[in-house]
Regions:
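Long, contiguous binding/interaction regions
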Residues: 1-56, 60-114
Length: 114
Protein backbone atom coordinates (compact mmCIF):
# COMPACT_ATOMS: atom_id res chain seq x y z
CA UNK A 1 0.00 0.00 0.00
CA UNK A 2 1.13 3.54 -0.70
CA UNK A 3 2.54 5.06 2.50
CA UNK A 4 1.52 8.51 1.23
CA UNK A 5 -2.13 7.61 1.86
CA UNK A 6 -1.40 7.37 5.58
CA UNK A 7 0.11 10.85 5.73
CA UNK A 8 -1.55 14.24 6.09
CA UNK A 9 -0.54 17.40 4.28
CA UNK A 10 1.32 19.79 6.58
CA UNK A 11 0.65 23.52 6.19
CA UNK A 12 3.50 25.19 4.34
CA UNK A 13 4.06 28.92 4.52
CA UNK A 14 7.53 28.92 3.04
CA UNK A 15 10.89 28.73 4.75
CA UNK A 16 11.66 25.28 3.35
CA UNK A 17 13.28 24.33 0.08
CA UNK A 18 11.27 22.65 -2.65
CA UNK A 19 12.25 19.11 -3.58
CA UNK A 20 15.26 18.80 -5.84
CA UNK A 21 15.01 16.65 -8.96
CA UNK A 22 16.26 13.48 -7.21
CA UNK A 23 13.62 13.80 -4.48
CA UNK A 24 10.98 14.48 -7.12
CA UNK A 25 11.86 11.30 -9.01
CA UNK A 26 11.93 9.26 -5.79
CA UNK A 27 8.42 10.37 -4.86
CA UNK A 28 7.11 10.19 -8.43
CA UNK A 29 7.49 6.40 -8.27
CA UNK A 30 4.79 6.40 -5.57
CA UNK A 31 2.14 8.15 -7.72
CA UNK A 32 1.41 6.23 -10.89
CA UNK A 33 0.75 8.21 -14.04
CA UNK A 34 1.54 11.66 -12.64
CA UNK A 35 3.84 13.68 -14.86
CA UNK A 36 6.43 16.19 -13.75
CA UNK A 37 6.00 19.45 -15.65
CA UNK A 38 7.34 22.98 -15.40
CA UNK A 39 5.52 26.21 -16.02
CA UNK A 40 7.02 29.25 -17.77
CA UNK A 41 8.57 30.37 -14.47
CA UNK A 42 10.39 27.00 -14.26
CA UNK A 43 8.31 25.88 -11.26
CA UNK A 44 7.73 22.13 -11.03
CA UNK A 45 4.18 20.75 -10.97
CA UNK A 46 2.66 17.31 -10.78
CA UNK A 47 -0.02 16.88 -13.42
CA UNK A 48 -2.39 14.16 -14.51
CA UNK A 49 -5.31 13.98 -16.90
CA UNK A 50 -8.21 11.71 -15.98
CA UNK A 51 -10.75 10.48 -18.55
CA UNK A 52 -14.45 9.89 -17.94
CA UNK A 53 -17.52 8.73 -19.85
CA UNK A 54 -19.28 12.11 -19.77
CA UNK A 55 -19.38 15.59 -18.27
CA UNK A 56 -21.27 14.62 -15.12
CA UNK A 57 -18.70 11.97 -14.15
CA UNK A 58 -15.93 14.52 -14.67
CA UNK A 59 -17.77 17.00 -12.47
CA UNK A 60 -18.43 14.38 -9.77
CA UNK A 61 -14.73 13.52 -9.71
CA UNK A 62 -13.74 17.19 -9.45
CA UNK A 63 -16.17 17.64 -6.54
CA UNK A 64 -14.58 14.68 -4.74
CA UNK A 65 -11.11 16.13 -5.38
CA UNK A 66 -12.37 19.36 -3.82
CA UNK A 67 -13.48 17.53 -0.68
CA UNK A 68 -10.13 15.75 -0.30
CA UNK A 69 -8.25 18.99 -0.97
CA UNK A 70 -10.20 20.87 1.69
CA UNK A 71 -9.61 18.08 4.20
CA UNK A 72 -5.87 18.16 3.44
CA UNK A 73 -5.63 21.95 3.29
CA UNK A 74 -3.75 21.66 -0.02
CA UNK A 75 -5.45 22.77 -3.22
CA UNK A 76 -4.68 21.82 -6.82
CA UNK A 77 -5.40 23.70 -10.02
CA UNK A 78 -8.25 21.92 -11.78
CA UNK A 79 -9.68 22.16 -15.27
CA UNK A 80 -12.40 19.89 -16.56
CA UNK A 81 -14.93 19.44 -19.29
CA UNK A 82 -16.79 16.74 -21.15
CA UNK A 83 -15.02 13.46 -20.41
CA UNK A 84 -11.90 14.76 -18.71
CA UNK A 85 -10.41 16.44 -15.66
CA UNK A 86 -6.85 17.72 -15.46
CA UNK A 87 -5.21 18.20 -12.08
CA UNK A 88 -2.02 20.20 -11.43
CA UNK A 89 -0.42 20.26 -8.01
CA UNK A 90 2.45 22.32 -6.60
CA UNK A 91 3.29 24.01 -3.31
CA UNK A 92 2.88 27.69 -4.15
CA UNK A 93 4.47 28.91 -0.90
CA UNK A 94 7.84 27.42 -1.91
CA UNK A 95 7.49 27.64 -5.70
CA UNK A 96 7.99 23.93 -6.22
CA UNK A 97 7.10 20.44 -5.17
CA UNK A 98 6.95 19.15 -1.60
CA UNK A 99 5.77 15.95 0.02
CA UNK A 100 2.30 17.55 0.30
CA UNK A 101 1.93 17.45 -3.48
CA UNK A 102 2.61 13.73 -3.62
CA UNK A 103 0.32 13.03 -0.65
CA UNK A 104 -2.50 14.86 -2.40
CA UNK A 105 -1.79 13.09 -5.71
CA UNK A 106 -1.99 9.68 -3.99
CA UNK A 107 -5.27 10.63 -2.32
CA UNK A 108 -6.69 11.88 -5.63
CA UNK A 109 -5.77 8.55 -7.23
CA UNK A 110 -7.60 6.76 -4.43
CA UNK A 111 -10.83 8.53 -5.46
CA UNK A 112 -10.64 6.78 -8.84
CA UNK A 113 -9.96 3.37 -7.31
CA UNK A 114 -13.01 3.48 -5.02
Amino acid sequence: MNDLLDKKCVPCEGGVMPFDISEIHKYQKKVDGWEITKNKEEIFFLSKKFKFENFLKSQDFVNEVGKVSEKEGHHPDISFGWGYAEIKVTTHAINGLSENDFILAAKIDKIISV
